Amino acid sequence: MNSDGRHHQSSSGAPRGPANPGQRGQVPPDDRLTAILPPVTDDRSAPHADSIEAVKAALDGAPPMPPPRDPLEEVTAALAAPPGKPPRGDQLGGRRRPPGPPGPPGSSGQPAGRLPQPRVDLPRVGQINWKWIRRSLYLTAAVVILLPMVTFTMAYLIVDVPKPGDIRTNQVSTILASDGSEIAKIVPPEGNRVDVNLSQVPMHVRQAVIAAEDRNFYSNPGFSFTGFARAVKNNLFGGDLQGGSTITQQYVKNALVGSAQHGWSGLMRKAKELVIATKMSGEWSKDDVLQAYLNIIYFGRGAYGISAASKAYFDKPVEQLTVAEGALLAALIRRPSTLDPAVDPEGAHARWNWVLDGMVETKALSPNDRAAQVFPETVPPDLARAENQTKGPNGLIERQVTRELLELFNIDEQTLNTQGLVVTTTIDPQAQRAAEKAVAKYLDGQDPDMRAAVVSIDPHNGAVRAYYGGDNANGFDFAQAGLQTGSSFKVFALVAALEQGIGLGYQVDSSPLTVDGIKITNVEGEGCGTCNIAEALKMSLNTSYYRLMLKLNGGPQAVADAAHQAGIASSFPGVAHTLSEDGKGGPPNNGIVLGQYQTRVIDMASAYATLAASGIYHPPHFVQKVVSANGQVLFDASTADNTGDQRIPKAVADNVTAAMEPIAGYSRGHNLAGGRDSAAKTGTTQFGDTTANKDAWMVGYTPSLSTAVWVGTVKGDEPLVTASGAAIYGSGLPSDIWKATMDGALKGTSNETFPKPTEVGGYAGVPPPPPPPEVPPSETVIQPTVEIAPGITIPIGPPTTITLAPPPPAPPAATPTPPP
């Protein structure tokens, strides 16, 4: 204890005295991190006015206070201070010095002899620091006023506003047939959109949108200050986030910023929207903004942009919209789904009237014209939605076109969904209709599980002219399925034989044979004895072609190689290696000649097209031309090199064609109409170990069209029979569909002939049948006789010998059963 009777802290030596009532005590140092405790004394006075102040001081960790002054000095300083101002001695950096211990009665500065008066705590009043209050107010004003201005200016200078046309919205790509008719639309996930130029939008439609959304559009700076302030309030305290945005702000929100949200993130989005809209107004013309806005805004029914909305609500081009129709579309922008006339006719009518009144207010419509307007009729929503959905076989064409664009033409999905592509395909509407009608006709009344696939390809360039994989736009595509081909694969054994110098006149036995314990027979015991390989192909003799395959160098692998050369894919989805016994690229087994391995319908059409083109292979393709929304040609097949690849020697291909020419007529009279030349081959596969069938084929071509037809069942797990229960062979329903498709597709075109084959293996084409054996003339001896009694004759005179002409040829034998 010192001379003044005050204790000192042992750890710091800072003075510590009793608390003066009404005064804030000295803040002790923060000793929470030390184990040294101050000494305990009898002095119970606290250094702070109350326990709360003590805790706050301890947490603040304030430095120790300097020693207090003498009480006499305190009084003297208080008396000398100006009125209303605390003595300077009580101000240390904005803090009062701590008072000393209370003095004796009368030592507080009161005149002697007076009774003690209630003490006024002048030092506490002196704690209010007006200088710091003023500084705080200035800082607050700077934050509230100057900071947003500086931030806005910096953001304005930094933000980069794209040029008109740089912002690519997701647009609908259109798929067209070769004649320009529409096949399908590739609709982006968020809906239907087709961009148009502002010049295509009638003036009254533009004025209706302005009247509905931003009546000062052409005069405002791109933003509404009152609307922005209202949006800020609603972001912070809840409420409608629309905020009375201008057309420019709405466009920025939809194209660049995104939809607003409540809270701080929503406020930041709104601020960004304001900056970009302001700068855009200085760099874009108002017409550019309006055009971009009309192409991006949502109108309901899955329609984005004024062009798609015109189709969705009125089924007409935007150029044909009337004043009343344009006003209704403008009325929908605020609440497109709920204001649809099909949902809320009264609300739609009220908003429509409001838009028309706005057009009068903005001088876009005269009062008389306004009075003449009638609320327009709209198409049903279901019809509008159906317009955006591809139906029937076209959906499978769309699928193939999309795949081809993505895989083959370096047109990625983003480009496909944003550039509003116009894709012209190779599909010939006449051929497509013929294929669809043929399938519908011949499958009508059959088993509901029966399915068919048809693909027609132009041999000159590989263009797919008709494509039918099923009638469900979103269903399974049987034209892309792996299916067993049966005897239609024998053609590739013939290709391999001719490539090895075995001509069409080569004779082969047709009797049954057994190889490795497997007995090979012909359907219904057919045979030709021994005949040439062209005749064996016409009759589809399994035994003859099995023997031919065994004779080939390479055997079954030679058949596989010939098939791949012609155009049979080496792999496709679901089959990593085609024509391979182990499925890993290993060699095939002998059953390849009978069509045991899986092949797609489109590949059979393509491979036969190679034969039709005298051995020149053209990859099958759907895409003829691709043009972007702004008219840029991205791809044009007519300018590409399409000379093809001579995969098979011309002489070989032409001899194969010659061997196949009689088959269509031989297969139950399926010659093409008008005597048109064709080359074809049927095929049938067996259903397991039964005598029933599972798949049936007819594949054939003319010089200008190759068509493959498959008929089977959904899962291939049941016998393929007609409605009457009869087994279906390739010469039956598939040949019917093939003939109808070819006749319909080629109707109106000139008949063509195949090239005359040159010699291969000593034969140029199919050798003529051997002449019948010569029959020597017969002689007849006539002996004159005379009857001498009833029933009794005797010769008279010498006999006479007469030479007779050869007998006339025997009538033709019965026609053999056509090949399956």
Curated annotation (Swiss-Prot):
The chain crosses the membrane at residues 139-159. This is Penicillin-binding protein 1A. In the N-terminal section; belongs to the glycosyltransferase 51 family. Residues 1-120, 792-820 are annotated as: Disordered. Residues 805-820 have a biased composition (Pro residues). Coiled coil: none annotated. It comes from Mycobacterium tuberculosis (strain ATCC 25618 / H37Rv). Disulfide bonds: none annotated. Pfam families: Transgly (PF00912), Transpeptidase (PF00905). InterPro entries: Beta-lactam/transpept-like, Glyco_trans_51, Glycosyltr_51/Transpeptidase, Lysozyme-like_dom_sf, PBP_transglycosylase, PCN-bd_Tpept. Cell wall formation. Synthesis of cross-linked peptidoglycan from the lipid intermediates. The enzyme has a penicillin-insensitive transglycosylase N-terminal domain (formation of linear glycan strands) and a penicillin-sensitive transpeptidase C-terminal domain (cross-linking of the peptide subunits). Has little peptidoglycan hydrolytic activity; however it inhibits the synergistic peptidoglycan hydrolysis of RipA plus RpfB. A penicillin-binding domain is found between residues 420-820. The lineage of its organism: Bacteria, Bacillati, Actinomycetota, Actinomycetes, Mycobacteriales. Its main location: membrane. Its EC number is 2.4.99.28, 3.4.16.4. GO terms for molecular function: penicillin binding; peptidoglycan glycosyltransferase activity; serine-type D-Ala-D-Ala carboxypeptidase activity. Residues 792-804 have a biased composition (Low complexity). It is a single-pass membrane protein. The gene is ponA1. It is found in: Cell membrane. GO terms for cellular component: outer membrane-bounded periplasmic space; plasma membrane. Keywords: Carboxypeptidase, Cell membrane, Cell shape, Cell wall biogenesis/degradation, Glycosyltransferase, Hydrolase, Membrane, Multifunctional enzyme, Peptidoglycan synthesis, Protease, Transferase, Transmembrane, Transmembrane helix. GO terms for biological process: cell wall organization; cellular response to hypoxia; peptidoglycan biosynthetic process; proteolysis; regulation of cell shape. Interacts with RipA via its transpeptidase domain (residues 561-820). Residues 41-53 have a biased composition (Basic and acidic residues).
